[in-house]
Amino acid sequence: MTELTETLELKLVEPNAHKHRKLCETKQVYQDALEAAFNANCTTQSAANDVVVNYDLSGYAKNALKKYVPQLCGGSYDAKELHDDHPVRFTNEGPKLDHKPQNAIEWYVQIPHHDDYHLWLPATPNPEQREWLEALHAGDAKMGECRLFTRDGEWYFHIVATRDVEERETSSAATPIRVDIGEASLLTVCHRDESDSPTAPN
């Protein structure tokens, strides 16, 4: 078995005014918490927790921050400054995916806002990733970290998904070569003598 990883993209379908405001609130508070933890140079999850615990975010966003900030502060990223438009990260326990094939918009994603309040939003996926989404919904793939962000004025949600696939067997035997009719005709045409009669190639 081989483990494959894919980042699935869902575009959130025109959130109403209330949900749009809640998404904006989550994004702003997350950015504030991220900046505070980064400026405090939190190199451990415990140090990051001491900062982000004071912010009005879901536990899933706080847990993602506790993992992410130490990577920025001397870890794998070792960033010197912070970009002002980071995506909101969530650990995989919070977001949920639902599929209603009978609806015009089939896919719905649950995005945590606070610990006791979540937003369900309709979403349109990348058509080429439908098989992955169906596997994720059926439990045949695992959800990893999720990210909420805006692009060109639209809201998007990314889900990192992994699943196991069977390895294809490779044969050591010679692979037969097939020639289609068009190629066969081309070979015949290419090997004719001066009188236009077929001849064996040199």
Predicted segments, located by residue:
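Nucleic-acid substrate recognition interfaces
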Residues: 1-202
